[in-house]
From Swiss-Prot:
SMART domains found in the cross-reference section: P4Hc
Name of the protein: PKHD-type hydroxylase PSPA7_5129
Name of the top EC class for this enzyme: oxidoreductase
Limits of the Fe2OG dioxygenase domain: 78-178
Cross-referenced PANTHER family: PKHD-TYPE HYDROXYLASE YBIX (PTHR41536:SF1)
Binding site for 2-oxoglutarate: R169
Species whose genome carries this gene: Pseudomonas paraeruginosa (strain DSM 24068 / PA7) (Pseudomonas aeruginosa (strain PA7))
Entry cofactors: Fe(2+); L-ascorbate
Length: 226
């Protein structure tokens, strides 16, 4: 499932965040890549312990944990602290699949990368290229969203970032360990949850809503891992 979540941050918030990112000191993005990915990765990245990365990352996590669409789709158990990258001057990241497990800095905890996310901090008209290209069973999807918008997709997906030939593309990326590791099961639960919410608005007193909600929770109980 590939899901677009709009306006996680407002235009004013994005403007302030981008201004701060533009003034930050960036490092070579290869530092956080695996062996294979490092050969394909050509970008800049904020160090994980950078104060700005922590500040923006904490604000992102607060928004995400209170966002009904993200919660419904991701069913998050753990979220890896957001990382931040910059693509400019031909920077790109060739096709790769993210590492299955990521160590949170310091090695105190691990996160299984069931879901990947990118939050855009640059508007599409501010740079050329830089599309996030995601491959799934239905083909290739090119994603280039407005600043403040997020895309959520399975961590098992082959994906790349096209070269940025003009301007700069600022973004955050992170991974989520879901209560439900299998994408097809998460998709079914998401569609069921969205249908229940719509029916609750349309026919709030319908007696079948109780049974349908019970079925959702019984499936979640069967498939979830804690």
């Amino acid at each position: 499932m590939l899901l677009h979540i709009p306006a996680l941050f407002t235009a004013d918030e994005v403007s302030r965040i981008r201004a701060a990112l533009e003034q930050a000191e960036w490092a070579d993005g290869k530092a956080t890549a695996g062996y294979q990915s490092a050969k394909a990765k050509h970008n800049l990245q904020l160090p994980q312990d950078h104060p700005l990365a922590r500040e923006i990352g904490e604000a992102m996590l607060q928004r995400l944990w209170n966002h009904p669409l993200f919660m419904s789709a991701a069913l998050p158990l753990k979220v890896f602290p957001p990382l931040f990258n910059c693509y400019t001057g031909g920077g790109s990241f060739d096709f790769h699949i993210d590492n299955a497990v990521r160590d949170i800095q310091g090695g105190r905890e691990r996160v299984r990368t069931d879901l990947s996310s990118t939050l855009f901090f640059s508007d599409p008209q501010d740079y050329d290229g830089g599309e996030l290209v995601i491959q799934d069973t239905y083909g290739l999807h090119q994603v280039k969203l407005p600043a403040g918008d997020l895309v959520l997709y399975p961590g098992t997906s082959l994906h790349k970032v096209n070269p940025v030939t003009r301007g700069a593309r600022y973004a955050s990326f992170f991974w989520t360990q879901s209560l439900v590791r299998e994408d097809s099961q998460r998709t079914l639960l998401f569609e069921m949850d969205q249908s229940i919410q719509q029916l609750t608005r349309d026919v709030p007193e319908h007696p079948s809503l109780i049974r349908l909600t019970g079925t959702y929770h019984n499936l979640l109980r069967r498939w979830s891992e804690l």
